[in-house]
Amino acid sequence: MRCRPNVKQVKARRGGVIKSIHKYREMGVRQSLGTDTFPLDMFNDMRMAATVCRIVEHAVDVAPSHEVFTMATVGGADGLGRPDLGRLAAGCKADIVLVRTDTFKASPVYDPFKFLVLSACGDDVDRVIVDGRTVVQGGVVLNVDMPAAVARLNEAALRVRSRIVL
């Protein structure tokens, strides 16, 4: 069965919504959650997916946080045809994001999935391990000159924008 991508924020910005996570699930449709637009923020996209579904369905239980998290991890990997991603299992890439839960914002943590989906943001990320290598430590991206990268990005955006006819 094909995997249906769910891009809530993009749809909502354009005045539309993808109706319901739980109705697709009940029909046996595998779902993934992803983003392809600014801001590239999976925490925000998980929050948006849960919130939009709850608004559309007028019910809080239709987009459980653990299911939205699964859409963003296992569902995303499955949607890409990558069984080696999105899960912590033997033979899979060791891609791990460690999020701080010892902060005032996160406390008390009754349900880590609810925190990750409904409250967390990039600033809560402490460490990121990609294929077994630490690439973020203490919330800081390692081996990247971020100010220089941002400057190059802004310069490239200006070049592209100058070529666009508005």
Where are these regions (language model features)?
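Conserved strand-to-helix beginnings and helix N-cap segments that scaffold or border functional pockets
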Residues: G15-I18, F43, Y110, P147
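Thr-Gly-centered strand-to-loop micro-motif
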Residues: P5-Q9, L33-D36, V99, D131, ...
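His/Asp/Glu-enriched, well-ordered alpha-helical/loop segment
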Residues: K19-T103, S119-C121
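Active-site microenvironment of metallo-dependent hydrolases
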Residues: T73-L166
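Flexible loop/turn segments at secondary-structure boundaries
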Residues: A12-R14, P39-M42, K105-A106, V136
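A conserved active-site cap/scaffold subdomain adjacent to cofactor or substrate pockets
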Residues: M1-Q31
